[in-house]
Amino acid sequence: MTSENPLDPNNAYAAADDAPLSEGDPTGAPADSGSDTLTAIQAARVAVKTLLDGGVRYVVVSPGSRSAPMAYALAEADAAGRVELLVRIDERSAGFTALGLALSTGAPVAVLTTSGTAVGNLLPAVMEANHAAVPLVVLSADRPDELRGTGANQTTDQLDLFGEHVRFAVDVPAGTNPQRAVETALSAATGVFEDTPPGPVQLNLAFRDPLVPPPADHLPEATGRRTWQIGRGPEPLTLAPAPATLAERRTVVLAGHDAGPVAEAFARAHGLPLLAEPSSNSRFGPNAVGPYRLLLEHFGPDSAQPIERVVLFGRPTLSRPVSALLARADVPSALYQPLPVAWYEPGRRTELPLDNLSDLADFSGRGSSGWLDAWLLAGAAAQHALDQALSEEPAATGPTVGALVWKHARGQLMLGSSNGIRDVDLAGQPAPEPHATIFANRGLAGIDGTISTATGIAWGGRQETTLLLGDVTFLHDAGGLLLGFAENDPLLRIVVLNDAGGAIFNLLEHGAVQESGTYGNAVERLFGTPHKVDISSLAAAYGVEHCAVSTTAELAKALAAPSSGRSIIEVRTDRAGLRKLHGRIKAAVGEAARSVLAG
């Protein structure tokens, strides 16, 4: 094979994006060279070109020797402007970064690792991608067949590593043409293959020495920097008003994770209250109710206006009152499901699955007289009572932080699992229009990889991005702050609610156990996981701007300040009184709701 200039017009990566493989073959091999004669570099170039032809525009790379052929081929494509590479030394962080890129772009994103434990570090991101239906393409480099099972260094069975968490996995033997395998993998990742939801796939690419390319004429460094903008949320939809022939019913619209603007449009068109989780991307508009989870009991079976039916969009994951409502045998519920989803198995849920809005409208009906007004009046009273209760707190609390971050978010907002997203769900007042695109890892709702996911979201969306998370979640992925000098800084503001431990357990049954005294110390140690980490020093070590605040006014000022790169706002709070605070909020909201509904 003769060496080729990656910027030569005949090179595949410099060709048009839609150029077929036969035009400007990137391998440099003769057309009749056969399927088992490719060098490692030739096979890697075929794989990369096929990925790009299939719509991959971002690849996250972790360094390694066995994966070097793919790294070199990707560097050539990067220099030609056909793909953007992002380098992360920690494979777990790389996996979640790729996940975030795929979330923000909606397109398949690849992550490249060398062999051995490097591949295993991708498992958490692959599991999340599976349950969240995210098109994540794992490119795992491997030893050739003759080295497997011999005790060769960094060699194990990689193909079965992810099990049922991948839509498709294939072993590509060394020296063979990977084009068909890559095409099939991309079809599976994007949901085209066998009519399944999108999700992760694995291409296990074996390479034989030599792993480096022949001398190239010239490989310039990529030029230009990304441009960033302050965006807004998804555009609202408009549906035709419900016809008068529809039956009147006391139906509520529940919008769970990833429901989308269609949930808001449906509620508005049919005169129904909208109970929307933050990551539904439908928590806006005139029908949205703020602290809805505290109001459900006031529309229960013994109330004057009990809920008769439920229409569900997306996946509900945040609150027990919602789960209890969906579990009620006396309240029929329907799930809008126009496409296959990854978060449940058919037949395992009680909701009636409907794939079109017309049938959904027949099920839901239109709001009964006074039904929507009752919810909106109760919601306004509840929001006022909640805001009043929070204003009486001398220092910032989780709900006040959630409300402020929600109010100030522009462009993209990611909410960490645990208390962060629940604080917003409780206290975040619905806006008239969508003001940001909301992301959250709700596939398996783990706290791992949150900073890395947000970094990928910021890179992919090319917008100002805010991340709200707790200190334990922050520390779990502190390595996600590490960026090399050659990587562009994303425009990412990280708000850390630091209460020196895991506050969510204070609000669960464990909080009551701790208050009882017998297991108090054990609960604090095992669930509270107290720490004394100096986040300012940690930020300095990674070269990230940091400021600390403790009051609502200080936080509002910090959120309003312009940002030019990555920054951390540390909100120092105390979780000791959190359980009692939530008790006061519930009591205040309950009193306000009862007063309004009593008329």
UniProtKB/Swiss-Prot annotation:
<dbReference type="GO" id="GO:0070204">
    <property type="term" value="F:2-succinyl-5-enolpyruvyl-6-hydroxy-3-cyclohexene-1-carboxylic-acid synthase activity"/>
</dbReference>
<comment type="pathway">
    <text>Quinol/quinone metabolism; 1,4-dihydroxy-2-naphthoate biosynthesis; 1,4-dihydroxy-2-naphthoate from chorismate: step 2/7.</text>
</comment>
<dbReference type="InterPro" id="IPR012001">
    <property type="entry name" value="Thiamin_PyroP_enz_TPP-bd_dom"/>
</dbReference>
<comment type="subunit">
    <text>Homodimer.</text>
</comment>
<comment type="function">
    <text>Catalyzes the thiamine diphosphate-dependent decarboxylation of 2-oxoglutarate and the subsequent addition of the resulting succinic semialdehyde-thiamine pyrophosphate anion to isochorismate to yield 2-succinyl-5-enolpyruvyl-6-hydroxy-3-cyclohexene-1-carboxylate (SEPHCHC).</text>
</comment>
<feature type="region of interest" description="Disordered">
    <location>
        <begin position="1"/>
        <end position="35"/>
    </location>
</feature>
<dbReference type="InterPro" id="IPR029061">
    <property type="entry name" value="THDP-binding"/>
</dbReference>
<dbReference type="InterPro" id="IPR011766">
    <property type="entry name" value="TPP_enzyme_TPP-bd"/>
</dbReference>
<protein>
    <recommendedName>
        <fullName>2-succinyl-5-enolpyruvyl-6-hydroxy-3-cyclohexene-1-carboxylate synthase</fullName>
        <ecNumber>2.2.1.9</ecNumber>
    </recommendedName>
</protein>
<feature type="compositionally biased region" description="Low complexity">
    <location>
        <begin position="1"/>
        <end position="21"/>
    </location>
</feature>
<dbReference type="InterPro" id="IPR004433">
    <property type="entry name" value="MenaQ_synth_MenD"/>
</dbReference>
<keyword id="KW-0808">Transferase</keyword>
<keyword id="KW-0479">Metal-binding</keyword>
<dbReference type="GO" id="GO:0030145">
    <property type="term" value="F:manganese ion binding"/>
</dbReference>
<dbReference type="GO" id="GO:0030976">
    <property type="term" value="F:thiamine pyrophosphate binding"/>
</dbReference>
<comment type="pathway">
    <text>Quinol/quinone metabolism; menaquinone biosynthesis.</text>
</comment>
<dbReference type="Pfam" id="PF02776">
    <property type="entry name" value="TPP_enzyme_N"/>
</dbReference>
<dbReference type="GO" id="GO:0000287">
    <property type="term" value="F:magnesium ion binding"/>
</dbReference>
<keyword id="KW-0464">Manganese</keyword>
<keyword id="KW-0460">Magnesium</keyword>
<comment type="similarity">
    <text>Belongs to the TPP enzyme family. MenD subfamily.</text>
</comment>
<keyword id="KW-0786">Thiamine pyrophosphate</keyword>
<dbReference type="Pfam" id="PF02775">
    <property type="entry name" value="TPP_enzyme_C"/>
</dbReference>
<keyword id="KW-0474">Menaquinone biosynthesis</keyword>
<dbReference type="GO" id="GO:0009234">
    <property type="term" value="P:menaquinone biosynthetic process"/>
</dbReference>
